[in-house]
Amino acid sequence: MVSKTPSTSSDEANATADERCRKGKVPKRINKAVRERLKREHLNELFIELADTLELNQQNSGKASILCEATRFLKDVFGQIESLRKEHASLLSESSYVTTEKNELKEETSVLETEISKLQNEIEARANQSKPDLNTSPAPEYHHHHYQQQHPERVSQFPGLPIFQGPGFQQSATTLHPPATVLVLPIQPDPQTQDISEMTQAQQPLMFNSSNVSKPCPRYASAADSWSSRLLGERLKASE
């Protein structure tokens, strides 16, 4: 009895080992089929996820329709990417143009600031020059106005002439006299000299009032203009 027990136990161990070896060894055909089935299941899961992302209808849930929709979606995406690239290039060019314009505006503002500062300096200099100096004497216009207020009767005698009273103008109204006119009257009236005397008499009041100046009338030669030449010829003949 004792010798049989170890033999039976060894047989059972060998039987279990054989069963394990049989279970671990899988035929090649069965292993390939399992791998293909797993791949198909994985692809089916990927197609289902793609259909969910593309939001396709259940009627068009075939793999061909899913692939067509995916290609169309990718074309749209690539078109949007190209348009975005073009917009990016245009924005870069516009940004460079804006930077150049900004630099030009800065230069113009700097030039304007310098011009404004120069003009302010000129205005300040002119304002300082135009300030009255209390140590100097007043202007001749002030003396003229003051003299008109003090001596209105003298100013009324010479309304057309200015009167200046000051250090630079020591002229008074009493020293002004009308210029004397010399008239030459022949024995016989000469029309030429008569016209000259009439013109001098007509111009005499105009010398005091320059506002009433009239244009002289033209005079043409007449037969009386040869009187002086005839008289000289007769005198020469008598002297011979």
UniProtKB/Swiss-Prot annotation:
Which GO BP annotation is one of this protein's? regulation of DNA-templated transcription
Region (Disordered), start-end ranges? 1-26, 128-153
Looking at the Swiss-Prot or TrEMBL record, what is one Pfam family this protein matches? bHLH_IRO3
Cite the record's tissue specificity text: Expressed constitutively in roots, leaves, stems, and flowers.
One molecular function GO term is:
protein dimerization activity
Coiled coil (residue ranges): 98-131
An example GO CC term for this entry is: nucleus
Q: In which compartments does the protein localize?
A: Nucleus
Indicate where this protein is primarily found.
nucleus
Q: Where is the composition biased (Polar residues)?
A: 1-13, 128-138
Question: What InterPro entries does the record tag this protein with?
Answer: bHLH_dom, HLH_DNA-bd_sf
Report the residue ranges that make up the bHLH domain in this protein.
27-77
**What keyword terms does UniProt attach to this protein?**
Coiled coil, DNA-binding, Nucleus, Transcription, Transcription regulation
Give the multimer and partner information. Homodimer. Forms heterodimer with PYEL proteins bHLH115, bHLH104 and ILR3.
Descriptive protein name: Transcription factor bHLH47
Query: What is the source species?
Result: Arabidopsis thaliana (Mouse-ear cress)
Q: Which gene encodes it?
A: BHLH47
